[in-house]
């Protein structure tokens, strides 16, 4: 487990517990999404690189609050200020990831990524979604990605689990077994 994962955990839990208790999970999810977009901007990356290990994270907080503007409510701003005061703002992306996971668990939903070499038809998508719903006991959202390098088959990523049924992987295994 990385240091950022450990640092982010209590902040993600506090954010989730608060948002759940005041029934605004979707609002907080949206605000986390906005901050994530800000964090991924080149200007933000420059600010992140300039922060000292023991220095203030105020420049990063200012940038996030300015860019987030009216999209961030006062409670979320206060949450960010607490993270900054504790010099934990660098973990905000990981807090976002953990918050999203907690929200999905709470709502019994799961997003599953499906990589395919060619598009699946409606019936295949429905059968796959049904099988995953039965396996995980959650409402499933499928995100499909076309990846011609797979040659054929499918690679399914559900949480931390990867099911690789691609032709490419099977050919690689065969080559390994034949010592080619």
Swiss-Prot record:
GO cellular component: plasma membrane; proton-transporting ATP synthase complex
Keyword field: ATP synthesis, Cell inner membrane, Cell membrane, CF(1), Hydrogen ion transport, Ion transport, Membrane, Transport
Protein's cellular compartments: Cell inner membrane
GO MF annotation terms: proton-transporting ATP synthase activity, rotational mechanism
Superkingdom to which the source organism belongs: Bacteria
Pfam entry (one): OSCP
Topology class, membrane: Peripheral membrane protein
InterPro entries on file: ATP_synth_OSCP/delta_N_sf (IPR026015), ATPase_OSCP/dsu (IPR000711)
Function according to Swiss-Prot or TrEMBL: F(1)F(0) ATP synthase produces ATP from ADP in the presence of a proton or sodium gradient. F-type ATPases consist of two structural domains, F(1) containing the extramembraneous catalytic core and F(0) containing the membrane proton channel, linked together by a central stalk and a peripheral stalk. During catalysis, ATP synthesis in the catalytic domain of F(1) is coupled via a rotary mechanism of the central stalk subunits to proton translocation. This protein is part of the stalk that links CF(0) to CF(1). It either transmits conformational changes from CF(0) to CF(1) or is implicated in proton conduction.
Assembly notes: F-type ATPases have 2 components, F(1) - the catalytic core - and F(0) - the membrane proton channel. F(1) has five subunits: alpha(3), beta(3), gamma(1), delta(1), epsilon(1). F(0) has three main subunits: a(1), b(2) and c(10-14). The alpha and beta chains form an alternating ring which encloses part of the gamma chain. F(1) is attached to F(0) by a central stalk formed by the gamma and epsilon chains, while a peripheral stalk is formed by the delta and b chains.
Alphabetized NCBIfam families for the sequence: ATP_synt_delta (TIGR01145), PRK05758.2-2 (NF004402)
Family: Belongs to the ATPase delta chain family.
Name assigned to this protein: ATP synthase subunit delta 2
């Amino acid at each position: 487990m990385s240091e950022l994962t450990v640092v982010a955990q209590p902040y993600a839990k506090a954010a989730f517990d608060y948002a759940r208790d005041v029934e605004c999970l979707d609002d907080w999810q949206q605000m986390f999404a906005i901050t994530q977009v800000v964090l991924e901007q080149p200007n933000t990356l420059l600010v992140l690189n300039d922060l000292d290990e023991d220095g203030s994270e105020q420049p990063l907080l200012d940038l996030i609050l300015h860019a987030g503007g009216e999209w961030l409510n006062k409670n979320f701003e206060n949450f960010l200020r607490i993270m900054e005061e504790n010099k934990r703002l660098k973990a905000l992306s990981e807090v976002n990831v953990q918050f999203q996971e907690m929200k999905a668990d709470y709502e019994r939903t799961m997003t599953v990524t499906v990589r395919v070499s060619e598009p699946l038809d409606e019936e295949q998508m429905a059968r796959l979604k049904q099988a995953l719903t039965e396996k995980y006991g959650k409402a499933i959202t499928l995100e499909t990605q076309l990846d011609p390098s797979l040659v054929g088959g499918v690679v399914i990523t559900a949480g931390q689990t990867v099911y690789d049924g691609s032709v490419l992987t099977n050919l690689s295994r065969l080559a390994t077994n034949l010592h080619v």
